[in-house]
Curated annotation (Swiss-Prot):
Gene3D superfamilies: Leucine-rich Repeat Variant, Ribonuclease Inhibitor. Residues 44-90 form the F-box domain. Keywords: Nucleus, Repeat. Its main location: nucleus. Changing R6A: Prevents nuclear localization. Expressed ubiquitously, with higher levels in root tip, pericycle and vasculature. It comes from the Eukaryota. It comes from Arabidopsis thaliana. Disulfide bonds: none annotated. GO terms for biological process: lateral root development. The keyword Nucleus applies. This is Protein ARABIDILLO 1.
C-alpha cells in the first residue's frame, strides 16, 4: 500500500515525556537597566538584556517543550521560564504524565487554571500537581477512569467550574461519581460527560441542589438518563443529550420545557420525533435553539419541514439550512448566512455580554461534536448535506476561538472524507468541497499554530485530503510540503505521526517527491525512526511508508540512503513486530534496491547487517502484505551477484519455495513476487539446482497457469532459468510443465511470457535433457517416474516454438524464391520481431553459448528459435546488448554466424535472424571503436 488515511486518533502507548527543568524562584526587575534592548557586543546580540516582559511574551508563543529548551539557555531565562504566569494552562495530552512528573511540575502549578489530559494514568496523577486553583479540567480517552479516580480529582479541586470527559465513553463512571462532583464542586458551571450507562435521578438532583451555578449540562451518548430529574436543574441554560438512547420523549418534553432559563437544547443523534420537537418549540418560553441534527425519526417525517412557524425559535436539522437558521438568531439581514460565524466572532470582540459569548460558544461546541460523531459513523444518505453544508460548517468552526472546537472540526474534516480506511479511499466530491471553500489554506494555517493539538489534527486532515491528487497539488502549491516536513521534526509524537502520514500520501505523486526531499522531509522521516524505534507503530509505519514512496525515485532513493535510511529500515525489518511497519519497511527496501546500476543502493542494502536474513524471515509472516513486500525486496536484491548468493546462504531458496507453494490462492501481487524472487535467484546455477531439489518446480508450473499476466510472466522467467539445468528440465516435463509452457507460448498476451516460455521449451528439448535422462537410466522416449512421453512432449513443444517464431515474421517475405537481405528489409524484420522488454534480460556466457550451440542443432525450429533469441539480446539500445555482444565476440562466434547465414542448409527464418544478428554485432563493434 502506498498511502494511508485515518479516521480517529487512537490512544497509544509510549507517549513522549514532558521535559521538566528544576524549579527556580521568580525574579523581579531590580532596576531600569534590565529593560534595555539587546545590544551589539563585538558583533553579537546580547539576548540576556531583552526586557523581561518581552521574554515572557516570547515564552507564551512556544509549546511546553520549546519553553523548556529556551529556558535551558541561561539562568536568567530558566527563572523566567518557571514564572507562574506561563503555567496558567497545561495540555498534557501528548505526554506521558505520571505521579513523578506531576510532582516535578507541582511548584509551577500554583496558579494553574486550565488543564487538559489524556488517559487513566494521567487522570490518576492529576492530584500530585497540587493545583488547588484549577477552574477547568478536560479529559479524553477516559474509558478506564473509575469513580474513585474522578471522585479524588474533584475532591482535591473544589474550585472547579468546568469538567468535561469525552468524547469517548466513560464506561466505568457511574452516578456515584456524579454525586461526588455535585458535593465537591459547588462553583461548577459546566459539566459534560460522555458514555455513562445510567444517570440516576439521585445524581441529577444532587447537581441541582449543590451546583446552583450549573448552566451548561451535557450527558452525551449515555444509555439511560432520568428525564424527570433533569427538569429540576432550574439553573441550566444549555442542555445536551446528543446520542443518548432510551429517552422517553413524552416525559422529557413535559419537564424540560418548564426549565425557566433553557436557551439551547441539543438532541442530535437521538430518536426524537416531531411531536416532542413541536412541544419544545411551542411550550418553552426561553428556548431559542433546538439542535436536532442526524435524528432519523425526525427526518422521516415531513410535518416539520416548514419549521418557521415557530416564531422566534430556531430548529437546526438536516432538512433545514443550518446557516440560515443560525443567521436568523440575529435579525441582521445584511449578513450572508455563511458569514454568520465570522459575524459572531466580530460580535464577541466588541460585546461585553457574557451571555451572548456563552451562547455562541455552546452552539459551536455542539455542532462540532455532532458533525464529528456523524462523520465517524458515516451514515448513508448524507452526501448532499456534507457537500452543501457540512464541509462549510467544519471549515467555519475551524476558525473558532475555542481550541477544542478547532481540533474537533479538523478531525471531522479528516474523517468525513474517508470512505475506506484500509484501502486509503476518500470521497472525491467531499474532498473537492473542502478545497473549493478554501479549506487547504485554513488547515495549513492551523498546522502552523504553536498549539500541538491543533498541529496534530490539522496534519491528519491534510494527510487524508492529500489522497486526492488535485488536493495534493493544492497542498504543495500552498507551501504544505515545507510545513509538514517541519512538523515531522516535532518532538511531539502525535504531531510527527500525522505529519509523516501527510508526507506519505503526498509522496505518491511523482511531482512531489523531490520537493519533499528539498524541504528536508527525507532526513526528518529517517530521524523519526531513530527517535521512536519502539512502541510507536503509527509513527514508524507512516515514516517507512513515506520513505518507501520516495525510494521509488532514483534521486530521492540516494537521499534516503545518504540520510541513514538503509540502516533505519533494516532495523525496522529486523526488530519491529507490527505488521504494518514490517510491510512498509520491506517495501521501502524493495524500492531502494530497484534502481539497478543507476546507484549502489542494491548492494548497500545487501551489505547492511541482518538485512537479507530479516527479509527472508518476513517471507514467513502470517500477514500477506508483509510476505509480498519481503519477496519483492528479495527479487530486486537478487539482481546483485553477491546478494543472490547471500540470500541463498540465509535460507532464501527454501523460504521462497515454501512461499510459492503456499500462495496458490493468494493475491496476484504475492504470486508475482514469489515467482519473481525465484526467477532472480535461479540466475545462479547452484540456486537453480537447489530450487528444483527443494520442490520449486510444481508451484512455478501452477503459477505459470495463472490468468494474471504479471504472474505467468515471472513464472515463465523462473522456469526458463530452471530449464537450463537438464535435471530441472526433466522435472518440468514430469510435473506437467510442457502443456503449461506451451499454453503460455501460444496464448499469453505478454510477449515476454511467450518468449521466455519458448526459450524454456527450447532448453528442454535441445538434447541435453535426453542425455541426462539416459545417464540416470530413464528411456529417452519415456520417463518412467511419471509415465510421461518425452517424444510426445518434444513434438508438442517444437510445434509451438515454431508457431511463436513465425508470428514475428511477415509471411510475405517468403513469397519469392529468393529472400532479400537488403538493409531495408532487415530493418523491417527487426522492427516487427523486436520484443522491447527483452532488452532488460541479461544472459550469462553459458546461456549465450548454449544458444550459439543451438544454431548447430539439426532441428530447424531450434535453429530459428536460437537465432531469434540472440537477435533480441543484441538489438542496439537494449540495456545489456553490449554485454551480450562482448560475450559472443570473446567466444569467436562471428565466423560461425557468417557461415550459418550463408549456408543453404540453414532454414530461411534462422538465416534472416542470423543476418540481423551479424548486423547487430557489426553495429556494436563500430560503436565501441569510436
Amino acid at each position: 500500500m502506498s498511502r494511508r488515511v485515518r479516521r480517529k486518533l487512537e490512544e497509544e502507548k509510549g507517549k513522549d515525556k514532558v521535559v521538566v527543568l528544576p524549579s527556580y524562584p521568580e525574579t523581579s526587575i531590580s532596576n531600569e537597566e534590565d529593560l534595555v534592548a539587546p545590544e551589539l557586543l563585538h558583533g553579537f546580540v546580547d539576548w540576556i538584556s531583552l526586557p523581561y516582559d518581552t521574554v515572557l511574551q516570547l515564552f507564551t508563543c512556544l509549546n511546553y517543550r520549546d519553553r523548556a529548551s529556551l529556558a535551558s539557555t541561561c539562568k536568567t531565562w530558566r527563572c523566567l521560564g518557571a514564572s507562574s504566569c506561563l503555567w496558567t494552562s497545561l495540555d498534557l495530552r501528548p505526554h506521558k504524565f505520571d505521579a513523578s512528573m506531576a510532582a516535578s511540575l507541582a511548584s509551577r502549578c500554583v496558579n494553574l487554571h486550565y488543564l487538559r489530559f489524556r488517559g487513566v494514568e494521567s487522570a490518576d496523577s492529576l492530584i500530585h500537581l497540587k493545583a488547588r486553583n484549577l477552574i477547568e479540567v478536560s479529559g479524553d480517552y477516559c474509558k478506564k477512569i473509575t469513580d474513585a479516580t474522578l471522585s479524588m480529582i474533584v475532591a482535591r479541586h473544589e474550585a472547579l467550574e468546568s469538567l468535561q470527559l469525552g468524547p469517548d465513553f466513560c464506561e466505568r463512571i457511574t452516578s456515584d461519581a456524579i454525586k461526588a462532583v455535585a458535593f465537591c464542586c459547588p462553583k461548577l458551571k459546566k459539566l459534560r460527560l460522555s458514555g455513562i450507562r445510567d444517570v440516576t435521578s439521585e445524581a441529577i438532583e444532587a447537581l441541582a441542589k449543590h451546583c446552583p451555578q450549573l448552566n451548561d449540562l451535557g450527558f452525551l451518548d449515555c444509555l439511560n438518563i432520568d428525564e424527570e430529574a433533569l427538569g429540576k436543574v432550574v439553573s441550566v441554560r444549555y442542555l445536551s443529550v446528543a446520542g443518548t438512547s432510551n429517552i422517553k420523549w413524552s416525559i422529557a418534553s413535559n419537564n424540560w420545557d418548564k426549565l425557566p432559563k433553557l436557551t439551547g437544547l441539543d438532541v442530535s443523534r437521538t430518536d426524537i420525533g416531531p411531536t416532542a420537537v413541536s412541544r419544545f418549540l411551542t411550550s418553552s418560553q426561553s428556548l431559542k435553539v433546538l439542535c436536532a441534527l442526524n435524528c432519523h425519526v425526525l427526518e422521516e417525517d415531513e410535518s416539520l419541514i416548514s419549521y418557521n412557524r415557530f416564531k422566534g425559535k430556531v430548529l437546526l436539522a438536516l432538512f433545514t439550512n443550518v446557516f440560515d437558521g443560525l443567521a436568523s438568531i440575529f435579525a441582521d439581514n445584511t449578513k450572508k448566512p455563511k458569514d454568520i460565524f465570522a459575524y459572531w466572532r466580530e460580535l464577541m470582540k466588541t460585546t461585553k455580554d457574557k451571555t451572548i459569548n456563552d451562547f455562541i460558544h455552546w452552539i459551536e461546541w455542539i455542532i462540532s461534536h455532532t458533525l464529528l460523531r456523524t462523520a465517524e459513523c458515516n451514515p448513508e444518505g448524507l452526501d448532499d448535506f456534507w457537500l452543501n453544508e457540512g464541509a462549510a460548517l467544519l471549515l467555519n468552526l475551524m476558525q473558532s476561538s475555542q481550541e477544542d472546537v478547532q481540533e474537533r472540526s479538523a478531525t471531522g474534516l479528516a474523517t468525513f472524507v474517508v470512505v475506506d480506511d484500509e484501502n486509503a479511499s476518500i470521497d472525491c466530491g467531499r474532498a473537492e468541497a473542502v478545497m473549493k471553500d478554501g479549506g487547504i489554506r485554513l488547515l495549513l494555517e492551523l498546522a502552523k499554530s504553536w498549539r500541538e493539538g491543533l498541529q496534530s489534527e490539522a496534519a491528519k486532515a491534510i494527510a487524508n485530503l492529500s489522497v486526492n491528487a488535485n488536493i495534493a497539488k493544492s497542498v504543495a502549491e500552498e507551501g504544505g510540503i515545507k510545513i509538514l516536513a517541519g512538523l515531522a521534526k516535532s518532538m511531539n509524537r502525535l504531531v510527527a505521526e500525522e505529519a509523516a502520514g501527510g508526507l506519505w500520501n503526498l509522496s505518491v505523486g511523482e511531482e512531489h517527491k523531490n520537493a519533499i526531499a528539498q524541504a528536508g522531509g527525507v532526513k526528518a522521516l529517517v530521524d523519526l525512526i531513530f527517535r521512536w524505534p519502539n512502541g510507536c507503530d503509527g509513527v514508524l509505519e507512516r515514516a517507512a511508508g513515506a520513505l518507501a514512496n520516495l525510494a521509488a525515485d532514483d534521486k530521492c532513493s540516494m537521499e534516503v540512503a545518504k540520510a541513514g535510511g538503509v540502516h533505519a529500515l533494516v532495523m525496522l525489518a529486523r526488530n519491529c513486530k507490527y505488521e504494518g511497519v514490517q510491510e512498509q519497511a520491506a517495501r521501502a527496501l524493495a524500492n531502494l534496491a530497484a534502481h539497478g546500476d543507476s546507484n549502489n543502493n542494491n548492494a548497500a542494502v545487501g551489505q547492511e547487517a541482518g538485512a537479507l536474513e530479516a527479509l527472508v524471515q518476513l517471507t514467513k509472516s502470517p500477514h500477506e502484505g508483509v510476505r509480498q513486500e519481503a519477496a519483492g525486496a528479495l527479487w530486486n536484491l537478487s539482481f546483485d551477484d553477491k546478494n543472490r548468493e547471500s540470500i541463498s546462504v540465509a535460507g532464501g531458496v527454501e523460504a521462497l519455495v515454501a512461499l510459492a507453494q503456499s500462495c496458490s490462492n493468494a493475491s496476484t501481487g504475492l504470486q508475482e513476487r514469489a515467482a519473481g524472487a525465484l526467477w532472480g535467484l535461479s540466475v545462479s546455477e547452484a540456486n537453480s539446482v537447489a530450487i528444483g531439489r527443494e520442490g520449486g518446480v510444481p508451484p512455478l508450473i501452477a503459477l505459470a497457469r495463472s490468468e494474471a499476466e504479471d504472474v505467468h510472466e515471472t513464472a515463465a522467467g523462473a522456469l526458463w532459468n530452471l530449464a537450463f539445468n537438464p535435471g530441472n528440465a526433466l522435472r518440468i516435463v514430469e510435473e506437467g510443465g510442457v502443456p503449461a509452457l506451451v499454453h503460455l507460448c501460444s496464448s499469453s498476451v505478454s510477449k515476454m511470457a511467450r518468449f521466455m516460455a519458448a526459450l524454456a521449451l527450447a532448453y528442454m528439448f535441445d538434447g541435453r535433457m535426453d542425455e541426462y535422462a539416459l545417464m540416470i537410466g530413464t528411456s529417452s522416449s519415456e520417463s518412467t517416474s511419471k509415465n510421461i512421453s518425452l517424444d510426445g512432449a518434444r513434438n508438442m513443444a517444437l510445434k509451438h516454438i515454431e508457431a511463436f517464431v513465425l508470428s514475428f515474421i511477415d509471411p510475405h517475405i517468403f513469397e519469392s524464391p529468393v529472400v532479400s537481405s537488403t538493409p531495408t528489409m532487415l530493418a523491417q524484420v527487426t522492427e516487427r520481431a523486436r520484443i522491447q522488454e527483452a532488452g532488460h534480460l541479461r544472459c550469462s556466457g553459458a546461456e549465450i553459448g548454449r544458444f550459439v550451440t543451438m544454431l548447430r542443432n539439426p532441428d530447424s525450429t531450434l535453429k530459428a528459435c536460437a537465432a531469434f533469441a540472440l537477435l533480441q539480446f543484441t538489438i542496439p539500445g537494449g540495456r545489456h546488448a553490449m554485454h551480450h555482444v562482448s560475450l559472443m565476440q570473446n567466444g569467436g562466434e562471428s565466423r560461425f554466424l557468417r557461415s550459418a547465414a550463408a549456408s543453404a542448409k540453414t532454414p530461411r527464418e534462422a538465416k534472416i535472424f542470423t543476418k540481423i544478428l551479424l548486423r547487430n554485432l557489426e553495429h556494436h563493434q563500430a560503436e565501441s571503436s569510436i
